[in-house]
Regions:
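A short N-terminal helical cap/helix-turn-helix that marks the beginning
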Residues: 2-21, 39-64, 83
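Short aromatic/basic micro-patch
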Residues: 43, 75, 152
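Structural core segment of the AMP-binding/adenylate-forming
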Residues: 1-14, 118, 122-164
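Short, well-ordered amphipathic alpha-helices
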Residues: 47-49, 89-90, 158, 162
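Conserved AMP-binding/adenylate-forming core of the ANL superfamily
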Residues: 59-118, 135-140, 144
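Acyl-group handling in specialized metabolite and lipid biosynthesis
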Residues: 32-41, 68-74
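Mixed-charge, low-complexity intrinsically disordered regions
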Residues: 18-19, 27-32
Length: 164
């Protein structure tokens, strides 16, 4: 049984209306996982998000972002989300960012944050979410403890990042 089949089972399970049946099916499903052979390679972004969701429901809404302060909102289809995530990953790769690199994300919660997170998953990067409220001292400690290979930040944070 491949990973795509497992994800399809989970999606079917989540759509069940009968909670008692859902509980029984979930229990059997998780028992089966205990004996499953772990695949040597698996990339959720490529195999499941793109290989399953983009392929089968590309034009359907995958993501809705809303700003509670301004009431601005944006929605993205599976295809759009994948496009923006891949665009971000391609730019990172052109900049020399490679699989296994530590990528700090010091950005506000905007759609691009989600695209960058997707790019990290697909590209095998280690995503390091970083609070936008961090001080120079806190960043210095983090950078010494866990050095960044790449850093994605809103330009308003560049001064504190450069100082660290």
């Amino acid at each position: 049984m491949g990973m795509e089949d497992l994800y399809r089972e989970v999606m079917d399970l989540n759509m069940m209306d009968d909670d008692d049946r859902k509980r029984d099916v979930a229990k059997a499903f998780f028992e089966k996982l205990n004996f499953m052979e772990i695949p040597e390679y698996f990339n959720w972004a490529s195999e499941i998000f793109e290989g399953l969701h983009v392929k089968e429901r590309g034009d359907k809404t995958a993501f809705i972002w809303a700003d509670i302060v301004t009431t601005e909102s944006k929605s993205y289809s599976y295809r759009d989300f994948s496009f923006h995530g891949n665009q971000c990953l391609n730019r990172l790769r052109k900049a020399g960012v490679e699989k296994g690199n530590n990528m700090y994300l010091m950005v506000p919660i905007v759609p691009e944050t989600w695209f960058a997170s997707y790019a990290c998953i697909k590209g095998g990067l280690v995503s390091v979410p970083t609070a936008t409220t961090m001080t120079q001292r806190e960043l210095e400690f983090r950078f010494e403890t866990y050095p960044p290979d790449a850093l994605l930040a809103d330009e308003i944070y560049t001064e504190v990042i450069d100082a660290a």
